Curated annotation (Swiss-Prot):
GO molecular function, one term: glycerol kinase activity
Native source organism of the sequence: Clostridium perfringens (strain ATCC 13124 / DSM 756 / JCM 1290 / NCIMB 6125 / NCTC 8237 / Type A)
GO BP annotations listed: glycerol catabolic process; glycerol metabolic process; glycerol-3-phosphate metabolic process
Protein name from the UniProt record: Glycerol kinase
Known EC number: 2.7.1.30
Amino acid sequence: MKKYIVALDQGTTSSRAIIFDKEQNIIGVSQKEFNQIYPREGWVEHDPMEIWATQYSVLQEVMAKCNITQENIAAIGITNQRETTIVWDKNTGVPIYNAIVWQCRRTADICDELKERDGLVDYIRENTGLVLDAYFSGTKIKWILDNVEGAREKAEKGELLFGTVDSWLVWKLTNGKVHVTDYTNASRTMIFNIKNLEWDERMLKELDIPRSMLPEVKNSSEIYGYANLGAKGGIRVPIAGIAGDQQAALFGQAAFNKGDVKNTYGTGCFLLMNTGEELVKSKSGLLTTIAIGLHGKVQYALEGSVFVGGAVIQWLRDELRIISDSSDTEYFATKVEDNGGVYVVPAFVGLGAPYWDMYARGTIVGLTRGTNRNHIIRAALESIAYQTRDVLEAMINDVGYDINCIKVDGGASRNNFLMQFQSDLVGKKVIKPIITETTALGAAYLAGLAVGYWSDKEEIAKLWFASEEFEPTISEERRNKYHKKWKKAVERSKGWALED
């Protein structure tokens, strides 16, 4: 009987299920979007029950579409939007509040208060690898416990559970039998110590989070539990791989070696560099995070998180309405010779790496009477590449060695104008893989390795092939001139939302 691996890819805007075979061919894909909830300015939520409903329905749908039963599934791998925080009742399984999404800035005030505490900023940097920011799960958990009536009392009694989205899905798939996360997701919470690989006692104390709420932290590739996808008493399918979306993409790009770099152009942009077993402390505003955890050992990575990448294209379409489809951007961007001196800094929810300014806001600078919509579309696209260059420069500065190329994936990597401009701007080769579903593929690899579907990383590396390569076509002088102007535009956006 032919066996397959199913990857559940739970993203910021949609839930997807993808079936892969042993040669990493995609056999089937199902996807459902779900609601984005914006209760106030800067707040972003999801309904956890809708996350679960859409994720489970696409799993059933893709199996039906491909005429595959649970007997054909060797294992399930899960990859997920990271940092997004869910707290639910251990006994009823009902979430006590909506999921607070990674983009949500509601805990900026909590972060400001924590920054006043003696030595805490440095402690967080040193032990969690992160910066003190509203982006991570820790302050989101605190907010829920402090603001949902009765939550803190229930948490103290051991009646509440916290999980990132992976934990929530595993808990639901196993009917509440398994409460786990993996090293990669734990490393994004700001309450996990990436040196001793344990939940950090001081951080739990500082944020007043009971340890009983927390999931057990496991390898990124092992059997965590079993999902029963059919009628009661049917075949139980092992859930055998978990990784946060960006780490899954790094693994799916076969970036197994020290110095390998990938950039995912999704809602945000996420540049990761594998630093092997070396925990590199960033001097440049990057995060030190766990790349993957296998066999009780971890590899580390440097990460630059850009909050608004492909989301700037959605903004052009949904808010400005100057394009009707995301794919139109490439056409309009090439209708003008250059950006006409226009720079878009899409700091809609603040600036991520390497600036970390929660109070920055979006700006468009350099407008003249001659500016038309094509200039704005082009400048918006270019902003994705500029932010990537900022992060890459910081990375190279931190590790002290250069890189040869960037492996790319994510929706916006389909835009050839953007990929060529990216190569021009960083002066490096940009390589697109044949399989661009690298996030789901990474989760599939992790699950497959745990059950012996693939034997080892070497077998996987042989399956990775490039589909397109982009080489730089402009001079260093020109790329630096462009970048200097961009930096000037960034300065204009900083601190905008601060009260006078």
